[in-house]
């Protein structure tokens, strides 16, 4: 009988679908990167998805985030994504946590018995905290570095944090991890594209010079085709890692 995962089953078989159905994956940050990662998980048949994000959809999200439409501005991102996934796979258990991952909330995050974590969050100090906790708990993690201020989606690659370069966020993360005694062992996706410089005349219009948060003062540029690709790559990587023990036959070169 045909079902929404029939095309997936052609490659990974019933045992592959069952493996994904029995997996729990967390997506931390459901924005331009995380919303596409979550959708990739849902359309692959992952059976339990934890969505973590405190934000509501903002008008500036509409250019790139999967759940962001003019009609959804002001609504919680996790709730919108949960409803979207329910229309893809009603059997998928979606846990929507409208909160930020912090030192006060992280224990609640890890209470769900996670098989994998996708980190698409923005705050570097909490990214570091998450990395340390995942290493301590032996939970596989892939963390997104910078997807803003980029225009070439073909420049993404997955590597150990120790092998990253060019990406300013990756540089900060490397430095902070070294101070914690961690030099390698954290899997990330980063771009080797040099970031663009935002237009100052536009920044004056959309930024807030009185804001305490740098991102509000200096909002980064973004588009539909870079963060989405990062999210899809992360989602695909997690799915295939969960399926690492499933035999997938390939055409042999002659």
Curated annotation (Swiss-Prot):
Q: Which UniProt keywords apply?
A: ATP-binding, Ligase, Nucleotide-binding
Give the E.C. number(s): 6.1.-.-
What's a single GO MF annotation on this record?
Answer: tRNA threonylcarbamoyladenosine dehydratase
Q: Which InterPro entries match?
A: ThiF/MoeB/HesA (IPR045886), ThiF_NAD_FAD-bd (IPR000594), Ubiquitin-activating_enz (IPR035985)
Can you supply a Gene Ontology BP term from the record?
cyclic threonylcarbamoyladenosine biosynthetic process
Query: Mind telling me which Pfam families this protein's record contains?
Result: ThiF
Signal peptide range:
none
Which family is annotated? Belongs to the HesA/MoeB/ThiF family.
Tell me the function of this protein.
Catalyzes the ATP-dependent dehydration of threonylcarbamoyladenosine at position 37 (t(6)A37) to form cyclic t(6)A37 (ct(6)A37) in tRNAs that read codons beginning with adenine.
From the Swiss-Prot or TrEMBL record, give the protein name.
tRNA threonylcarbamoyladenosine dehydratase
Q: What phylogenetic lineage does the species belong to? A: Bacteria, Bacillati, Bacillota, Bacilli, Bacillales
